[in-house]
């Protein structure tokens, strides 16, 4: 139907030859059937020829390639390290030279020992810090006039020869006792206590500033004073005011600091304290809470009690020994004077005993004025109500009332302190004072 006589196409797409032109053809294998579901790769002529053949097994080849890459990285790292060493070599040589200069300046280390006995000008017996004693030589450049038994010396680290004398240094505990910065409190910050201020000025301050007045009148100024009274009456405050008003060296120590753990350390600390005070004279030694070491002597049953008594005996010796104290004044403070040893309070050691009573009405008013001078008070505050009260107030109690009133105002976000704040503060302070420590709290 509708087809011409020329014939159709064969399986390969070639036109079939006409029936009349029949010739014999060579055998050709049939083309493989096309794979279903897989796309054939297109072969590119020149690129396919240049591509390397597939090598098997591929896993071992990849591992070897990875190993070679790691070896290459290590070789590059080594090369970089060698280059850095060559570059840093001049800097290391300079650092080594600087270290050698520092070592030369520092010198060889020396050990510290004690001189036990001088044999002659060139030999001595010394003891090291380890313990043994040695017969050693004394080098020619050592100042032999300063050599005396018991002094500290410097010894060569290897041959233990005496190469120098170690000057006595201040005990670190004593250096801490020195007040470097004068306290801010002055006599104007003390409410009342006019008589006490006058007495301490005559006994402590005036002999240091104008000693010629005592020479003209023919008397020796007092060696020391003791301040005693109830807690919070201004004993330590007055001592701070003395330190503020005078230019003398002020050494402050608490009595409990003189009690040391090891035998003999307490008396040694007392001697060192007064030696430093003598070197830095004119000076004032203030020992607070003297009742810690100055209690009455009795038969001690333990080593600690005997050590406290030895410390007090050394204190008595320093106050009234053969060596004159000169420009060194002593101020003691305690609130238990009845427990002190009578030998400590006798004239010649402590010449003036200054009592600090509870403040009277005039003193209360002055103390309230001092502590409220920088406070912002409302108009309804009446301080006379607290001044005229019958409760026994100390100066510390009045300060606590003013501070507590300010805290109550801050709690309510107010910038002014009102009269009810002072009333609540007074009730709180007096309640705590009367209540005291609950019985059995520390049992």
Curated annotation (Swiss-Prot):
Pfam families in alphabetical order: AAA, AAA_lid_3, Prot_ATP_ID_OB_C
Induction of the gene: Induced by treatment with the proteasome inhibitor MG132.
Alphabetically ordered keywords of this record: ATP-binding, Cytoplasm, Immunity, Innate immunity, Isopeptide bond, Nucleotide-binding, Nucleus, Proteasome, Stress response, Ubl conjugation
Domain of life: Eukaryota
Basic and acidic residues bias (residue ranges): 12-28, 87-106
GO biological process: female gamete generation; innate immune response; lateral root formation; leaf morphogenesis; maintenance of root meristem identity; male gamete generation; meristem growth; meristem structural organization
Tissue: Preferentially expressed in the root and shoot apical meristem.
Classification via InterPro entries: 26S_Proteasome_ATPase, AAA+_ATPase, AAA_lid_3, ATPase_AAA_core, ATPase_AAA_CS, NA-bd_OB-fold, P-loop_NTPase, Prot_ATP_ID_OB_2nd
Location relative to the cell: Cytoplasm, P-body; Nucleus
Record note on disruption phenotype: Displays disruption of cellular organization in the postembryonic root and shoot apical meristems. Leads to decreased 26SP accumulation, resulting in reduced rates of Ub-dependent proteolysis. Shows hypersensitivity to heat shock and increased oxidative stress tolerance. Displays enlarged leaves, stems, flowers, fruits, seeds and embryos, caused by increased cell size and shows increased branch number and nuclear size of trichomes, in correlation with increased ploidy. Mutant displays enhanced susceptibility to the fungal pathogen Golovinomyces cichoracearum.
Residue positions binding ATP: 229-236
Region of interest (Disordered), ranges: 1-55, 87-108
Cross-link Glycyl lysine isopeptide (Lys-Gly) (interchain with G-Cter in ubiquitin): residue positions: 296, 433
Sample GO molecular function, one term: ATP hydrolysis activity
GO cellular component: nucleus; P-body; plasma membrane; proteasome complex
PANTHER family from the UniProt entry: 26S PROTEASOME REGULATORY SUBUNIT (PTHR23073)
Role noted for this protein: The 26S protease is involved in the ATP-dependent degradation of ubiquitinated proteins. The regulatory (or ATPase) complex confers ATP dependency and substrate specificity to the 26S complex. Interacts with transit peptides of proteins targeted to the chloroplast, and may be involved in the degradation of unimported plastid protein precursors. Is required for the maintenance of postembryonic root and shoot meristems. Has a specific role in the regulation of organs size. Acts redundantly with RPT2B in the regulation of gametogenesis.
Oligomer status and interactors: Component of the 19S regulatory particle (RP/PA700) base subcomplex of the 26S proteasome. The 26S proteasome is composed of a core protease (CP), known as the 20S proteasome, capped at one or both ends by the 19S regulatory particle (RP/PA700). The RP/PA700 complex is composed of at least 17 different subunits in two subcomplexes, the base and the lid, which form the portions proximal and distal to the 20S proteolytic core, respectively. Required for innate immunity. Interacts with UNI.
Family: Belongs to the AAA ATPase family.
Protein name (Swiss-Prot/TrEMBL): 26S proteasome regulatory subunit 4 homolog A
Organism field: Arabidopsis thaliana (Mouse-ear cress)
The gene coding this protein: RPT2A
């Amino acid at each position: 139907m509708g087809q011409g006589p020329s014939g159709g196409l064969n399986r390969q797409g070639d036109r079939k030859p006409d029936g009349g032109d029949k010739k014999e053809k060579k055998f050709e294998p049939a083309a493989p059937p096309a794979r279903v579901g897989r796309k054939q790769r297109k072969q590119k002529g020149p690129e396919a020829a240049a591509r390397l053949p597939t090598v098997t097994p591929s896993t071992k080849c990849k591992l070897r390639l990875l190993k070679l890459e790691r070896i290459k990285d290590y070789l590059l790292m080594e090369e970089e390290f060698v280059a850095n060493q060559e570059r840093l070599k001049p800097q290391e040589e300079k650092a080594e030279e600087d270290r050698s200069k520092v070592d030369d300046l520092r010198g060889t280390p020396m050990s510290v020992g004690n001189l036990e006995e001088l044999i002659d000008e060139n030999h001595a017996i010394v003891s090291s810090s380890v313990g043994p004693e040695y017969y050693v030589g004394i080098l020619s450049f050592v100042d032999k006039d300063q050599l005396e038994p018991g002094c500290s010396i410097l010894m060569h680290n290897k041959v233990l020869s005496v190469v120098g004398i170690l000057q006595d240094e201040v005990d670190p505990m004593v250096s801490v006792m020195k007040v470097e910065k004068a306290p801010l409190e002055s006599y104007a910050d003390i409410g009342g206590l006019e008589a006490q201020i006058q007495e301490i000025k005559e006994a402590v301050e005036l002999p240091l500033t104008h000693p010629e007045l005592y020479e003209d009148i023919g008397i020796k100024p007092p060696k020391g004073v003791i301040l005693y009274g109830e807690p919070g009456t201004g004993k330590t405050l007055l001592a701070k005011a003395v330190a503020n008003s005078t230019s003398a060296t002020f050494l402050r120590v608490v009595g409990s600091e003189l009690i040391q753990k090891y035998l003999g350390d307490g008396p040694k600390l007392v001697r060192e304290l007064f030696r430093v005070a003598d070197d830095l004279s004119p000076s004032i030694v203030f020992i607070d809470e003297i009742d810690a070491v100055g209690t009455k002597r009795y038969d001690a049953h333990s080593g600690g009690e005997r050590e406290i008594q030895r410390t007090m005996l050394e204190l008595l010796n320093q106050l009234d020994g053969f060596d004159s104290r000169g420009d060194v004044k002593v101020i003691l403070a305690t609130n238990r004077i009845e427990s002190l040893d009578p030998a400590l309070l006798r004239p010649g050691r402590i010449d003036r005993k200054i009592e600090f009573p509870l403040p009277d009405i005039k003193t209360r008013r002055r103390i309230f004025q001092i502590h409220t001078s920088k406070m912002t008070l409302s108009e309804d505050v009446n301080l006379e109500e607290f001044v005229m009260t019958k409760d026994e107030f100390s100066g510390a109690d009045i300060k606590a009332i003013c501070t507590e009133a300010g805290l109550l105002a801050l709690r309510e976000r107010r910038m002014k302190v009102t009269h009810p704040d002072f009333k609540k503060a007074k009730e709180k302070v007096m309640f705590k004072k009367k209540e005291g420590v609950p019985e059995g709290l520390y049992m």
